[in-house]
Amino acid sequence: MARIAGVNIPTNKRVEIALRYIHGIGPAKAKEICEQVSILPERRVSELTDAEVLQIREVIDRDHQVEGDLRREVAVNIKRLMDLGNYRGLRHRRGLPVRGQRTHTNARTRKGPAKPIAGKKK
């Protein structure tokens, strides 16, 4: 099992798919990384040589922000919005949808489970 950016990459999957197990790498970036290293995306991770795995690791470390660094940057950006006290920061602080979605009904994922209202009957 190859280890890239602190993540164990599954060996039985294609390189293009296996790279997506790394937080911050999606379909487009995975394809781009394969092109930079000149590896066919259809090859299996188990078929890669140690040198190719090392090349992939170097490209990711050099050109892409992934895993802990990416998570940390997102958290810092959200904290900055909350400290500024602007509208988006307030929505984050209150645990409500940030991007303009309706909250009269729905928004349960962001707001959590519905709180029962005393005395209300159907």
Swiss-Prot record:
The gene is rpsM. It holds the Pfam family Ribosomal_S13. Located at the top of the head of the 30S subunit, it contacts several helices of the 16S rRNA. In the 70S ribosome it contacts the 23S rRNA (bridge B1a) and protein L5 of the 50S subunit (bridge B1b), connecting the 2 subunits; these bridges are implicated in subunit movement. Contacts the tRNAs in the A and P-sites. One of its GO terms (biological process) is translation. This is Small ribosomal subunit protein uS13. The keyword rRNA-binding applies. It comes from the Bacteria. GO terms for molecular function: rRNA binding; structural constituent of ribosome; tRNA binding. Keywords: Ribonucleoprotein, Ribosomal protein, RNA-binding, rRNA-binding, tRNA-binding. Part of the 30S ribosomal subunit. Forms a loose heterodimer with protein S19. Forms two bridges to the 50S subunit in the 70S ribosome. Belongs to the universal ribosomal protein uS13 family. Residues 92-122 are annotated as: Disordered. InterPro entries: Rbsml_uS13_C, Ribosomal_uS13, Ribosomal_uS13-like_H2TH, Ribosomal_uS13_bac-type, Ribosomal_uS13_CS. GO terms for cellular component: cytosol; small ribosomal subunit. It comes from Maricaulis maris (strain MCS10). NCBIfam families: uS13_bact (TIGR03631).
